Regions:
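Pyridoxal 5′-phosphate
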Residues: 1-396
């Protein structure tokens, strides 16, 4: 049983992780509704007085701690409100370039990439999707061909792990393809990677990227805080202050930054990631093996193996023939199991563009549900899911 979720079984970690306790927050004491420890540096980090400088010191300490975990320089990290804003800041900075070049993005990107690209296109910036294979991944050869086809492209956005299917991109080979294209043309190609579903789950090498986005709440940290890594500083789209080097103006979220630093140290250290990744693989190897025994069940994609290196072991997409995904989600919820149909950012949309890009037919797309696990997931959670599915299929 997932103790953090009480008597229910939470298997929607890709949407948000079960919160963990971390340093600056404690259980509420003395009527303090926020549970902030006495002495917390509450001042505005931009203020010159003692309280402000204490907050500034705490903010920069949090930045340095994050940098140590990610193995990058602190000055290349910028605190934001989360993955969506981090992605938007990078994309919209392209509007401020002297020459407006084309942007490429994988056809399975998170809505915060795809929808912002649509906005940029409406503003006159050319964009083009990169096709994916049936497993939802972008091949290095495909990226190379896309860059050859679009010689005016100077930007490529390809996520680390897909948030709906768990497809695991070979980022190293993709970056190599972008750099080779750059060497041939003599023109730079900015490589951006949405690492929201990768951080803390699979090994990542951020230093090779030009930019990357992260979110705390996917790791069990606070909502409303994220990170943007920039190898080279970009011009911010909006103004209103010099905070975060002008990349992200506005009074900084010191409490959130400390939360993010704490959760990165707890969940994203390389050895911790390796150990937890192995545990996750064993759990989902069991789950996928049991799902295969259910007659009306099919994995998406259909050739996903029980322990498949093409996929993150934290997310699996599965469908049940003749049962719409939302119907199965509601049926499982009544059985005490929380899953989803896909991205929480598009939960009100019946369309499944990620599955469509993978070549999944319309009916099968609508039958898909996403199961995603976390660090406290155990066999009892998976068995509850399997029992709930069997019960639902008995009357659906």
């Amino acid at each position: 049983m997932n103790e953090s979720a009480g008597t229910r079984h939470y298997l929607d970690w890709a949407s948000t992780a079960v919160p963990e306790k971390f340093l600056p927050i404690d259980e509420a004491k003395g009527g303090n509704p926020y549970g902030i420890r006495e002495g917390f540096p509450f001042g505005n980090p931009s203020s010159s007085h003692t309280e402000g400088q204490a907050a500034k010191d705490a903010l920069e300490s949090a930045r340095s701690r994050c940098a140590r975990v990610l193995a990058v320089e602190p000055e290349k990290l910028y605190f934001t409100s989360g993955g969506t804003e981090s992605n938007a800041l990078v994309l919209h900075s392209c509007l401020l370039r002297k020459e407006r070049h084309k942007l490429l993005y994988s056809a399975v990107e998170h809505p915060s990439i795809v929808e912002n690209c649509m906005v940029l296109e409406s503003l006159g910036l050319p964009v083009s999707p990169i096709n994916v294979e049936k497993d939802g991944r972008v091949n290095a050869e495909t990226l190379s061909r896309a860059l050859e086809k679009h010689p005016d492209a100077r930007f490529a956005a390809i996520m680390g792990v897909n948030n709906e299917t768990g497809s695991l991109m070979d980022i190293s080979s993709l970056i190599s393809a972008a750099r080779l294209s750059q060497a041939k043309s003599g023109l730079p190609v900015h490589f951006h990677c949405d690492l929201v579903q990768a951080l803390g789950k699979v090994p990542v090498n951020i230093g090779d990227m030009d930019s990357a986005s992260f979110s705390a709440h996917k790791l069990g940290g606070m909502r409303g805080i994220g990170l943007l890594y920039l190898k080279k500083k970009l011009k911010g789209l909006y103004s209103g202050g010099s905070q975060e080097g002008g990349v992200r103006p506005g009074t900084e979220n010191t409490l959130g930054a400390l939360s993010l630093a704490g959760i990165l140290e707890r969940r994203a250290m390389p050895e911790t990631v390796r150990q937890e990744n192995e545990k996750a693989r064993e759990r989902f190897k069991y789950l996928i093996g049991e799902l295969r025994k259910i007659k009306r069940c099919a994995l998406i994609p259909g050739d996903r193996e029980d322990d498949d290196p093409r996929f993150s072991p934290w997310i699996v997409q599965v469908r049940f023939r003749e049962v719409p995904g939302p119907v199965m989600v509601r049926a499982l919820d009544k059985e005490g199991v929380a899953v989803s149909t896909g991205s929480a950012c598009s939960s009100n949309s019946p369309e499944r563009p990620v599955l469509q890009a993978m070549g999944v037919d319309g009916k099968a797309r609508l039958e898909g549900i996403r199961v995603s696990q976390g660090w406290s997931t155990d066999t009892a959670d998976l068995d509850a899911l399997l029992d709930g599915i069997k019960k639902a299929l008995s009357f659906l």
